[in-house]
Amino acid sequence: MEIAGKAVCVFLLLAIIKLRRSEGINRVSANLGHNTVMTCPTRTNISMVTWKINPKTGHQCTLAYRIDKDSTGKTNCSDRINWRSRPDWDQALEIQQVGKADEGNYTCEVVNADGNFHRLYHLTVIVAPRMALYCDDYGNPVCEAETEKSAAEISWVPESNSTPRADSHDNGTVTVVSWFAARSTNGKNPTCIVSHATLNETKSINCSSSYRDLILCIAIILSFLIIITFMAVIYYLKLHGCRFCHRSKPPDIIPTYSSQDDTVEVEPYTTYVQKENVIYNSVSDLTLRQNLPQGQSPAT
């Protein structure tokens, strides 16, 4: 019985291995911000393909395709993670603009009549170190270094009195910025030295000449604009302003009177005088008659 039990266990184990064939873990790396592609086992007469993604942080993501129904499914996957092409003839997975959150395990499962076949990946995202040395708007040398944690160390030759500033980002990188603030360079160009486990680089720069050139360029542009503006003002005054200067004074208006107006004004007065005389004469005649004795008539 014991031997029979062991035989059954071995048979079941072999059956499971046949149905679930998997390869060893494939370790892949991708640069931060770049695209990466992972492929599935090559098999014929595939009936179903499934990608199972287990990142270090976040939820599990699943991509599936069924051949018989020609349908795809997607669960908890970002738009950056998708099939590289049509899954009916290319089951590869593509991740666009890889980030630190994409690190983790990726498994492709292919199903056909012979069983289930798996290919496992472990993705590591590499942050390529970056160094930049430039001049700021005031003509001061600035040195930057972007690396994975921990932060890079920046030093200057000649020695600088400034304190570097470190900024941490969500993608797991750290950017260190340092300004050169030495009082004197003794005629030598400032040199930035970056030290890190993934980056050791040295660069020099001369900002004095570039800063003077910038100031000269700005001065020339401003002078040109001032001249153009001054000429435009003069032209405007010449074209419009002198019209107001040379305008002549309008002539004085002398009122005119017509003889007809005088006649109209005199006629009412003459009529009034005539009426007064008539009334006066009538009153005088009446008074004279009352004062005469009876039987006498006033002399005419």
Swiss-Prot record:
Molecular function GO labels: signaling receptor activity
Topology feature Extracellular, residues: 25-213
Gene Ontology CC entries for this record: external side of plasma membrane; extracellular region
Underlying gene: CD200R1A
Sites carrying sugar chains: N45, N76, N105, N171, N200, N206
Superkingdom of source: Eukaryota
Residue intervals passing through the bilayer: 214-234
Disulfide cysteine pairs (residue numbers): C40-C108, C143-C192
Domain named Ig-like C2-type: residues: 122-206
Cited Gene3D superfamilies: Immunoglobulins
Family recorded in the similarity comment: Belongs to the CD200R family.
Pfam families: V-set
Keywords: Disulfide bond, Glycoprotein, Immunoglobulin domain, Membrane, Phosphoprotein, Receptor, Repeat, Secreted, Signal, Transmembrane, Transmembrane helix
Cytoplasmic side: 235-300
GO terms under biological process: regulation of neuroinflammatory response
Name of the protein this chain belongs to: Cell surface glycoprotein CD200 receptor 1-A
Cited PROSITE patterns: IG_LIKE (PS50835)
Signal peptide (UniProt feature, chain positions): 1-24
Keyword Phosphoprotein: yes
Residue ranges annotated for the Ig-like V-type domain, each copy included: 25-124
Post-translational modification: Glycosylated.
Tissue spec. comment: Highly expressed in macrophages, peripheral blood lymphocytes (PBL) and peripheral blood mononuclear cells (PBMC). Weakly expressed in bursa, thymus, spleen, liver and brain.
